[in-house]
A protein has these predicted regions:
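Short, Lys/Arg-enriched, disordered terminal segments
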Residues: 1-15, 583-587, 591, 645
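Intrinsically disordered, low-complexity N-terminal extensions of nucleic-acid-metabolism proteins
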Residues: 1-3, 9, 120, 253, ...
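Helicase motor core with emphasis on the C-terminal RecA-like subdomain
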Residues: 3-21, 25-29, 33-55, 61-65, ...
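A broadly structural signal marking compact, well-ordered functional cores
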Residues: 95, 227, 231, 245, ...
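C-terminal accessory region of SF2 helicases/translocases
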Residues: 287, 305, 313-322, 328-638
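Gly/serine-rich nucleotide phosphate-binding loop at the start of the catalytic core
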Residues: 70-71
């Protein structure tokens, strides 16, 4: 094994890797500071807003180091996307996430030990399994990356108990440095992340959350639909409209299309092909507006979004800041608009019992879950079951939203693991040798085009299951997505490939055997404390939208612990305060009338000549002159103004 480069050599190597694999000549913002820190094996926390280039900060130093980077992230769709992007660059990467079979997990872990891979992406829930920890001891891990690291903090808006297991992984790898990354963290969360990840020394790098090109606007209106149409007609460019539920996505989309504003809708309940097609139409500009729930946006690469509009209030500043931040990533002028009605305050407070249903309700959901799966007392440990929430609610007369919340709380309490709306990306593995491909040419031109497109687009298809995108293959071959699917199924039947199609599958995984519902213990940390913090975040959101005296950009920055002494000058509050200031600077009308009379008593003037001597605009002067004329105090003779004798 070659010796590890020193810090200065690593810095040079990092720059060379950036150029070789990504084509960039230099790092952006604080990327280089973070990379230098982790390259020196220092535990590091990087605070970077959405679109700040987080992935570069761990992918570059990991390639410079010997061994493999362990990447812990809860975002399964993003995990798969990054693995695929790394493979396209010729970098070996694998992923383990909820829903994979035990055999697939074992094969993946064995490849990490013997296959010279550089990255293993893993969901936090998988860290606690015996098989992972056994195999981990045999791996050469160079660094640990914790993405969405705010999830480890109970002060955070998205606390996940599985993240607490990372500290145990650190004990197994005591000499391995950790890089924690997040786009949203308050000062309390920043401290908590470092403590819970057992940082040897406090070490934080912050990229400013200020967005000089993004204007934050709150429009108070009781007719949100009319205001939405007005905004989209007034402001050109690509847009995202966020709404709270799936039904509204369709309703708003139909409204916009009827008004000749091209729009599509997107939510987690759509099938994968529909999602991909609509996302492609929007990204290519074929559809101007994407109307979506918060399921849309993570990992979307579209820098020219000009406006993000929230028709409904998010339930935290953190969520709003992340969604609003998808506008204007190209650095050009953009807008983030919230439409706020008085009824929104009541609506937001009603989310509290939906998000934290009564404990007895949660126990009832747990018990009915056992009836649903016909699970005996004491059974269930490590059982994986697909879960159809609509079917479950229909059978047991529940509403989906509080059931979803109950399952999340049971996950937090450690009784099960619930992964909602999980997308399983298609995978393919050739089961014949490369030198046998020649015989497939006899199967027709379409088949030959498909195979050639697969070989050109993806590496490693003869040695490992590789994620593929049927829509991309359709574009490259000129075939339809349906034809691609049918051809791959045909190849699988002939045992030429092993093909695992995409599937949208929510899962419930039992992390403990079934117990009596009344024995379910939900601790204050999981329930009461989190509920109180949720209420605090809701109140912060309401303070933001009802505020009319403080610059909105400063208000957001202050929430995340960043001090800023100047106003943005472009939010609705700044514009309103500036208008009021200008109005207050103008003398009152009685004073202006007296001033006009004083000037005209000394000399007769035209209106234009008078305007040069007075601090007012033309419209106001016209109003003053009409008033003085009506009162009989001045007259105009051949266009010359004078005092009436």
């Amino acid at each position: 094994m070659s010796s590890q480069p020193d810090a200065s050599q690593l810095s040079t190597l990092n720059s060379r890797i950036l150029k070789q694999y990504w084509g960039y000549d230099r790092f952006r913002g604080i990327q280089e500071d973070i990379i230098d820190s982790i390259s020196k094996n220092k535990d590091t926390l990087g605070l970077m807003p959405t679109g700040g280039g987080k992935s570069i900060t761990f992918q570059v130093p990991a390639l410079a180091k010997e061994g493999m980077c362990l990447v812990i992230t809860p975002l399964i769709a993003l995990m798969k996307d990054q693995v695929q992007n790394l493979k396209k660059r010729g970098i070996k990467a694998l992923a383990i996430y909820s829903g994979m079979s035990r055999q697939d997990i074992i094969i993946t872990l064995e490849n990490c030990i013997f296959g010279n891979y550089k990255f293993l992406y893993i969901s936090p829930e998988r860290l606690d399994t015996e098989i992972f920890r056994t195999k981990l001891r045999k791996m050469h891990i160079s660094m640990i990356t914790v993405d969405e690291s705010h999830c480890i903090s109970q002060w955070g808006y998205d606390f996940r108990p599985a993240y607490l297991k990372i500290a145990e992984i650190r004990e197994l790898l005591p000499d391995v440095p950790v890089l924690a990354l997040t786009a949203t963290a308050t000062p309390e969360v920043v401290k908590d992340i470092q403590a819970r990840l057992h940082f040897r020394h406090k070490n934080v790098f912050r990229m400013s959350f200020e967005r000089n090109n993004l204007a934050y606007i709150v429009r108070k209106t009781e007719n949100k639909t009319a205001e939405l149409l007005h905004i989209l007609r007034s402001m050109p460019g690509s847009a995202i409209v966020y709404v709270r539920n799936r039904r509204r996505t369709k309703e708003i989309t139909e409204l916009l299309n009827n008004e000749y504003i091209t729009a599509d809708f997107y939510h987690a309940g759509l099938d994968d092909a529909t999602k991909d097609i609509r996302q492609h139409r929007w990204q290519s500009g074929e559809s101007r507006v994407m109307v979506a729930t918060n399921a849309f946006g993570m990992g979307i690469d579209k820098p020219d979004v000009r406006i993000v509009i929230h028709m409904d209030l998010p339930d935290s500043i953190e969520a709003y800041f992340q969604e609003a931040g998808r506008a204007g990533r190209d650095g050009q002028k953009a807008y983030a608009v919230i439409l706020y009605a008085k009824s929104d305050k009541t609506t937001l407070h009603k989310r509290i019992p939906d998000t934290f249903p009564e404990k007895e309700y949660i126990r009832d959901v747990y018990e009915h879950l056992q009836y649903y799966y016909q699970m005996a007392m004491g059974d269930g440990l490590d059982c994986v079951r697909e879960f159809n929430i609509e079917d479950f609610c229909r059978k047991f007369k529940y509403f989906p939203v509080p059931v979803d919340s109950a399952l999340r709380i049971l996950t937090q309490a450690g009784y099960l693991e619930y992964t909602a709306e999980q997308d399983s990306t298609s995978r393919i593995l050739f089961t014949i040798r490369r030198d046998e491909l020649y015989r497939l040419r006899e199967m027709g031109e379409d088949m030959d085009r498909l195979i050639q497109a697969v070989l050109r687009s993806y590496t490693g298809v003869f040695t490992d299951y590789t994620y593929i995108n049927e829509d991309s293959l359709a574009i490259r071959t000129g075939l339809t997505r349906r034809q691609i699917y049918e051809q791959l199924v045909h190849l699988a039947k002939l045992r030429i490939v092993s093909y695992i199609p995409r599937k949208k599958t929510p899962y419930i995984i039992y992390t403990r055997e079934r117990i009596e519902a009344q024995r379910i213990h939900i601790s204050p940390e999981v329930y009461e404390h989190r509920k109180a913090r949720y209420e605090t975040r809701i109140n912060a959101m309401l303070d933001y939208v009802t505020n009319d005296t403080v610059c909105r950009s400063r208000m957001l920055l202050d929430y995340f612990g960043e001090r800023n002494e100047h106003n943005c000058g472009q939010c609705d509050t700044c514009i309103s305060l500036r208008s009021k200031s200008k109005a207050s600077e103008q003398p009152d009308r009685e004073t202006l009338c007296a001033k006009v009379c004083e000037i005209l008593s000394c000399e007769s003037l035209t209106p234009a000549g008078l305007l040069k001597q007075l601090p007012m605009d033309k419209e106001l002067l016209t109003e003053i002159l009409h008033r003085l004329s009506d009162e009989g105090k001045i007259i105009a003779v051949d266009g010359i103004l004078q005092i009436k004798k």
